[in-house]
């Protein structure tokens, strides 16, 4: 059972209650606090599109605490972040691993942040396939193409060479918030909200 807090606001028309995520959305805050999958991606994409339609000139604040997940679902979020006119500021709270770290780096340059005790982890895409040898070969080629594409995007987002990104994503690569800043995945470590 999932518990979602309700917030009650006083207005001149009386009281109004919201679930906490709807209330945060009013302040242009989007949360990813679970695995990236088709359902979470659909919700996040819808929120990004809604906020851009509401005011394309105002920033959107995307808070990330995620172990990662589906590459295709994550790429739907990534593409939407790049497509919309609104700047998307990303903030790591807790952990941004795998696709979570990729989305963290996808924020508007200069507006990518992490809290001081956050942890960021990058690695190569994972895949497990079974079936006929020909089909396994097709899937292996696909995952190698995806790996190359993700590494190129990380290289572009961080300023690191493609060779360094390839080496650094060969295995799980955990970083503190400060290390992620040095690497170029984020721009600043927050200790207090500005």
Swiss-Prot record:
Compartment(s): Cytoplasm
Per its UniProt record, what InterPro entries does this chain match? ClpP (IPR001907), ClpP/crotonase-like_dom_sf (IPR029045), ClpP/TepA (IPR023562), ClpP_His_AS (IPR033135), ClpP_Ser_AS (IPR018215)
Question: What keywords appear on the UniProt entry?
Answer: Cytoplasm, Hydrolase, Protease, Serine protease
Q: Which reaction does it catalyse?
A: Hydrolysis of proteins to small peptides in the presence of ATP and magnesium. alpha-casein is the usual test substrate. In the absence of ATP, only oligopeptides shorter than five residues are hydrolyzed (such as succinyl-Leu-Tyr-|-NHMec, and Leu-Tyr-Leu-|-Tyr-Trp, in which cleavage of the -Tyr-|-Leu- and -Tyr-|-Trp bonds also occurs)
Q: Which GO terms of the cellular component aspect does the record hold?
A: cytoplasm; endopeptidase Clp complex
Which residues act catalytically here? 98 (nucleophile), 123
Q: Which Pfam families match?
A: CLP_protease (PF00574)
Molecular function (GO) terms for this protein are:
ATP-dependent peptidase activity; ATPase binding; serine-type endopeptidase activity
Task: Give the enzyme's EC designation.
Answer: 3.4.21.92
Which BP terms in the Gene Ontology apply to this protein?
Answer: protein quality control for misfolded or incompletely synthesized proteins
Tell me, in one coarse class, where this protein mainly resides.
cytoplasm
Q: Which family does it belong to?
A: Belongs to the peptidase S14 family.
- Outline what the protein does: Cleaves peptides in various proteins in a process that requires ATP hydrolysis. Has a chymotrypsin-like activity. Plays a major role in the degradation of misfolded proteins.
Question: What interactions and quaternary structure are annotated?
Answer: Fourteen ClpP subunits assemble into 2 heptameric rings which stack back to back to give a disk-like structure with a central cavity, resembling the structure of eukaryotic proteasomes.
* Protein name, per record: ATP-dependent Clp protease proteolytic subunit
Give the species this sequence originates from. Clostridium kluyveri (strain ATCC 8527 / DSM 555 / NBRC 12016 / NCIMB 10680 / K1)
């Amino acid at each position: 059972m999932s518990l979602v807090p309700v917030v009650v606001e006083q207005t001149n028309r009386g009281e109004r209650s919201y679930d906490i995520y709807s209330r945060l959305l009013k302040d242009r805050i989007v949360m990813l606090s679970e695995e990236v999958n088709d359902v979470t991606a659909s919700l996040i994409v819808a929120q990004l599109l809604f906020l851009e339609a509401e005011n394309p000139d105002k920033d959107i604040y995307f808070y990330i605490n995620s172990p990662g997940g589906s590459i295709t679902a994550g790429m739907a979020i990534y593409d939407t972040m790049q497509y919309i006119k609104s700047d998307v500021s990303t903030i790591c709270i807790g952990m941004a691993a795998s696709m979570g770290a990729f989305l963290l780096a996808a924020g508007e340059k200069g507006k990518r942040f992490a809290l001081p005790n956050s942890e960021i982890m990058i690695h190569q895409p994972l895949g497990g396939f079974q079936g006929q040898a020909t089909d396994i070969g097709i899937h292996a080629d696909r995952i190698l193409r995806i790996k190359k594409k993700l590494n190129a995007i990380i290289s572009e987002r961080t300023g690191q060479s493609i060779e360094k990104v390839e080496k650094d994503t060969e295995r799980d690569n955990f970083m503190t918030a400060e290390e992620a800043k040095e690497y170029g995945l984020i721009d600043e470590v927050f200790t207090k909200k500005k």
